[in-house]
Amino acid sequence: MTANSPLQRIGQEKGIAMGSQELQRKLGFWAVLAIAVGTTVGSDIFVSVGEVAKAAGTPWLTVLAFVIGGLIVIPQMCVYAELSTAYPENGADYVYLKNAGSRPLAFLSGWASFWANDAPSLSIMALAIVSNLGFLTPIDPLLGKFIAAGLIIAFMLLHLRSVEGGAAFQTLITIAKIIPLTIVIGLGIFWFKAENFAAPTTTAIGATGSFMALLAGISATSWSYTGMASICYMTGEIKNPGKTMPRALIGSCLLVLVLYTLLALVISGLMPFDKLANSETPISDALTWIPALGSTAGIFVAITAMIVILGSLSSCVMYQPRLEYAMAKDNLFFKCFGHVHPKYNTPDVSIILQGALGIFFIFVSDLTSLLGYFTLVMCFKNTLTFGSIIWCRKRDDYKPLWRTPAFGLMTTLAIASSLILVASTFVWAPIPGLICAVIVIATGLPAYAFWAKRSRQLNALS
């Protein structure tokens, strides 16, 4: 049976088990949308407005940068939507690169994600929650690490016991994180000062010109818009993926675009632009200009940040283990990661082991900071994924349930915008980034050779 045979496609679409113990389709549109939005709206927005303002140089270019930054993500989501409906199974980039014809490249993408991105991200977010909690009450550093570990364990148990229960929580926490941001927007509109938009431009405009300043601002928004494609990790558990995936991917992009644009608009109107451009905590600083909040702004932002990051942490604990599950089902990862709990119908071992690795990184935070240099590899992986659709479309068995409109233009924009992020990441840390790429290849290829050989042996016996 081919990877995308008619019988298997029917099984994938309807959630029929193709073998023993498969994950079932239990997630509807609203749960999927909540996961996409909840993953994307994270701690980045609490600092990115200031970074974008500094790069853009004027209030209007700051707002425009968020608009364009969100719009250029739409082509990327269109590519993901088509690929996810062509291969409605768990695994995201790994699955798409594999079906594009490169199992080694697919394995390397999953290998790098597991060790250098997924588990470390759990520790980073858990520690960020504790850091914001420390703003409210002093916390001993060691105790803080145990609290962070406890958060990961709590979400492990939640998502291990029920995918529906985890999705319900994710929906609630996503609503909870949007409410305070909506309050900020409402207060910002009420206390908006138009004269802040008429303030003199910063030196960035005189040095580089408006167009280059706008490009710099757009680049600074890039990380704020990452996370929507997380739902592609769980496509195999989503009901009616042919309709749900495009709606959730593109819909989440539009929702986040509107939210971020309004936040950028009101924050730029609340405080003098020169102060915004030099602020490391722009939302907190902007709220101090609201008489109704004053000195309580910091507390409000700290609580909001904890809710926001809690939602992102929960989402990551939920979707990330599906990648290793997919690799294990292909006999290209540790077999235990492919285990499905007979009662809860979740990839229990994958959830537990990834959470355990995340807890390990909490107690070796110096190592976690070094893993940030693998960002270049992860960005390049995304570029390859967008390019994989070109090769997938050449396959005779490629029959997506939804196709990207204006395919050539959308694919070009998706690849180009991703390459811009690769370039900016390379400029940030060129040598460490290249070293990390070598590490991924040097460790990943032998690991792939081992599992590929073992997979062939298992196939020969079956």
Tell me what each language-model feature is.
Residues 48-54, 74-152, 157-160, 306-326, ...:
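Hydrophobic transmembrane alpha-helices that form the core helical bundles
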Residues 70, 111, 132, 136, ...:
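Alpha-helical transmembrane segments of multipass membrane proteins
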Residues 143-194, 208, 249-253, 374-384, ...:
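Membrane-interface loop-to-helix entry segments
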